[in-house]
Amino acid sequence: MSFLNIFTFFSVLVSVATAVRFDLTNVTCNNLHGPHCGTYVMEVVGQNGTFLGQSTFAGADVLTESAGDAWARYLGQETRFLPKLTTIASNDTKNFSPLIFTTNIYTCNPQSFGDAMVPFANTVTGEIEYNSWADTADNASFITGLANQLFNSTQYGVQVASCYPNFASVILSTPTVNIFAANETLPDYCTAIQLKAVCPPDAGFA
């Protein structure tokens, strides 16, 4: 890549807005019901009825194989059988389910998510990884894991944004949710978001 191309690329990055940081270290227990201090969903600030969750879709390999093979993969809980994309959407969006947080009994801060395994982009290795959302899990990547960056957002200084890359607009009707480092700037297809804790019944979730 030539020097001119590199300079142009970085000039574009510098021209875009920086994502909003959010802090989950001061979540209170008021009106939060469930195990420990409570369970709750994360709503996007300024977008009523839009929550952090997952969209599920069937891959091409699933659609082309026999019903018996597909059923066996489903029963075996194969992680890549029905890929889940972390996104933001309303409760009535098809194939969407919100991520349910559970709080720690001592601190009332987020401890784990309802789903056990969620794909995320490891910006250190540049690979897609599957990580436990539990903050205390043995197999959690303490620094690079998406879950731990969310749980300790102030310490790690992460930024959160909703993004609409070209591939997502083709296969999904909802954007991806991306985590950026504090010193990164956003691509032009990303928009900064901020999240807040909401009690599931108050948000319309049973």
Swiss-Prot record:
Localization (cell): Cytoplasm, Cytosol
Keywords linked to the UniProt accession: Cytoplasm, Signal, Zinc
A Pfam family annotated for this UniProt entry: Vel1p
Signal peptide as annotated in the record: 1-19
GO cellular component: cytosol
Residue ranges that the Swiss-Prot or TrEMBL entry lists as coiled coil: none
Induction data: By zinc depletion.
InterPro entries according to UniProt: Vel1-like
Keyword presence, Signal: yes
Protein family (similarity comment): Belongs to the VEL1 family.
Name assigned to this protein: VEL1-related protein SCY_5430
Originating organism: Saccharomyces cerevisiae (strain YJM789) (Baker's yeast)
